[in-house]
């Protein structure tokens, strides 16, 4: 399931092998269209 970006240490990116992040810190694989983690308008790097 989703995890905290700081916890899994993955960079925030649009790449499928990276982590998608939002202001809440929740993230999920960018290929997961059901639970994408957050809107693309809220993406940022940690």
UniProtKB/Swiss-Prot annotation:
Keyword Cell membrane (UniProt): no
Origin: domain of life: Eukaryota
Subcellular location: Secreted
Record has Repeat as a keyword: no
Molecular function terms, GO-annotated: sodium channel regulator activity; toxin activity
Residue positions, PTM D-phenylalanine: 44
Chief localisation class: secreted
Residues with PTM 4-hydroxyproline: 2, 11, 29
Assigned GO CC terms: extracellular region
InterPro entries assigned to the protein according to its UniProt record, in alphabetical order: Conotoxin-I_CS, Toxin_19
Tissue: Expressed by the venom duct.
Keywords: D-amino acid, Disulfide bond, Hydroxylation, Ion channel impairing toxin, Neurotoxin, Secreted, Toxin, Voltage-gated sodium channel impairing toxin
Disulphide bonds in the chain: 5-19, 12-22, 18-27, 21-38
Role description: Iota-conotoxins bind to voltage-gated sodium channels (Nav) and act as agonists by shifting the voltage-dependence of activation to more hyperpolarized levels. Produces general excitatory symptoms.
Domain description: The cysteine framework is XI (C-C-CC-CC-C-C).
Family stated for the protein in its record: Belongs to the conotoxin I1 superfamily.
UniProt-recorded name of the protein: Iota-conotoxin-like R11.17
Organism: Conus radiatus (Rayed cone)
């Amino acid at each position: 399931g989703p995890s905290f970006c700081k916890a899994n240490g993955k960079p925030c990116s649009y790449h499928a092998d990276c982590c998608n992040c939002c202001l809440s810190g929740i993230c999920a694989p960018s290929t997961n269209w059901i639970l994408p983690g957050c809107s693309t308008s809220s993406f940022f790097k940690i």
